[in-house]
């Protein structure tokens, strides 16, 4: 590897082992307080950094990128999704963008199944009865009844790495696998999962018992689950989202939950994080969690290792392995 040590600015606190390695390899400026950078701080960072390492909480938009100095040549995103970055503007200014695909697949798929179980079996409600409410009066044949998931139809929106991993887990639980994607997956994968492809999202939504959102947030998927589409779902159906909050019309979802027009929702992501739609907070049939889907020690370290490899490869004069291309957006 080249002995040159580029100035790398990291916007958030990363696992200690990752930060230690980055300090060894690069001229690294860390965020010791883990306080999210404001707009002014981000603008200052891009004026001096050769490499910027942002996270999902950092909005690297055109306004920020237009203030970047000529030395900024790589944005090594600490995350799989790149909807926090104006990739088109970055590329037009000769800035390479990378992400960390693959390493969060299993963790997010595990969490998706946990949300399905939490909503279907009312697990969070039960925990509150024992804990915060302390109102449990003993077992009853008709108390706290949820729904069996075995044999139900699961509709997966977005059959990429995470969607496919969810399907494998769901099949083991006895769910029938259905999916909507830009195109069908490989026939061998369909055969393995006994999965049914739906070209029409509308038709799939109307027939599913459970819907799992696993697609990225892009201009094409912004509020993909609109009020009109949500109304197509069965009254007793549930929806879980471990992708991005922007994919669902949150106000429409809240209205339907309030009116009893949906069986429940499990949400780990929100459109205006960390703010959460007040109507969702009041919805009795909603399980709301603070963007924990990929939150494992192993996953965060793996993400950091991906970032380091991307930076090292770039320093050595090669294309980073996880370069984001226009065709991927």
What are these regions (language model features)?
Residues 1-98, 206, 226-228:
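An N-terminal-biased, well-structured beta-alpha scaffold segment characteristic
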Residues 12, 55-56, 79, 208, ...:
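Glycine-rich, N-terminal phosphate-binding loop of Rossmann-like dinucleotide-binding domains
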Residues 93, 97-98, 111, 222, ...:
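Rossmann-like dinucleotide-binding domain for NAD(H)/NADP(H)
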Residues 60-64, 182-279:
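Rossmann-like adenosine-cofactor binding region
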Residues 50-51, 74, 210, 238, ...:
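Short, Asp-centered acidic motifs that coordinate Mg2+ and/or phosphate
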